Amino acid sequence: WEHIRGIEPYEISHPPLGKLIMGVGIRLFGMTPFGWRFMGTLFGVGMLPLLYVFLKNLFGRTSIATCGTVLLAADFMHLTQTRLATIDTYAFFFILLMYYFMYRYLTLPAGAPFRKCALPLFLSGLFWGIGAASKWTVIYGCTGLVVLYFIGLYQKLRDWPADGETGARQPGRLKWAFQILAFSVLVFALIPAAIYTLSYLPYAWAEGDSSLTGLVGAMWENQKYMLSYHSGVTDTHPYSSRWYQWLFDIRPILYYMDNSVPGYTTRFAAFVNPVVCWGGLLAVLACAVQAVRRRCARALFIVIGYLAQLVPWFFIGRITFAYHYFPSVLFLILALCYVFYSLSEQEELIAWKPAMYAVTAGAAALYALFYPVLVGIQIPSWYGTCLLRWLPSWPF
């Protein structure tokens, strides 16, 4: 709202681009619940076809891509967070895109011309820059991109086609490596830095100094504030949780509760669909085993992405919540689909499609069961205590 009005913003604990995106809905529909939630919901819907395309590229099977997309659509966190006016939706969206285009680059054959490699690298870097300017958690994902990038670079140079007569590596390899490295500095460092800095133009305009010096100064001052703010949060919260609790859905965050009507309750919470959370964790472990034993590139890709989003939280001492696990849901679903794909390779021994459809249907059934507490619909108190309180720490 402040950015739209051209005044200094009150809430400055995150980079501004996510709120600028949110402001598009407010400009279109006014300062109303529909207006401030519109863009988040739109991005939430947009994730689904993007994930489908990603899964189709990863595994090449329509049935797996469809079931993986349904798993995201049926995830509790996906519904809850994309309906709220929060920036977590944009972080997830851009993480999805930056990993998709990195995968497209990694799967290009060794010896592919620079021009063919440039586009997926550019798009991966572009969406990483946009994501980082929306929320810092996207920066965690960039660590995974860096690891994957250098693994891919090593493999492409190692497998570079040899000359048919001499058996020596073609001389174009060094030229290609120089071009790729120089281009990567541009698309993963310089362009994202420019996007990040330019996202602070509303700050500079509000302060009356839109010069380059004023823009950089406004950006830098906010970085210092954000670092101080996030490292200095010491307050407690009854629905906070630590990273090791996220792995098992131990503590949902309760956004709203109303017990004013006797015998009825209204709850509104964010947590991961148990099928995705628990099944996905087992699937990530399976991917880790396959990455080590079979040196499976797909499995390694998924494990690196998952760890890049999770491991930084090991070292963060400030109060945290279940929604911080939201970006990891992407890799839980990728891991589940990897397991489906692995089973499909043994279809003469295992009826993999019924198993995949059963898992997907189970997630959809839980989505229907828990729907009232994902959107804040009033329910009889017995419904929560008898059907929804699976763990003592679940606030239903």
Model features per residue range: what roles?
Residues 59, 98-121, 150-160:
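Membrane-interface transmembrane helices that cradle and orient dolichyl/undecaprenyl
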Residues 40, 77-90, 134-137:
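Short acidic/glycine- and proline-prone juxtamembrane loop motifs at membrane-interface regions
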Residues 68-73, 80, 128, 132:
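Short helix- or helix-capping micro-motifs
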Residues 116, 147, 153-157, 161-188, ...:
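Transmembrane helical bundles and short interhelical boundary loops of multi-pass, membrane-embedded
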Residues 259-263, 267-295:
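Hydrophobic, aromatic-rich transmembrane alpha-helices
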Residues 15-20, 29-49, 66, 81-85, ...:
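Loop-to-helix entry region of an early transmembrane alpha helix in multi-pass inner-membrane enzymes
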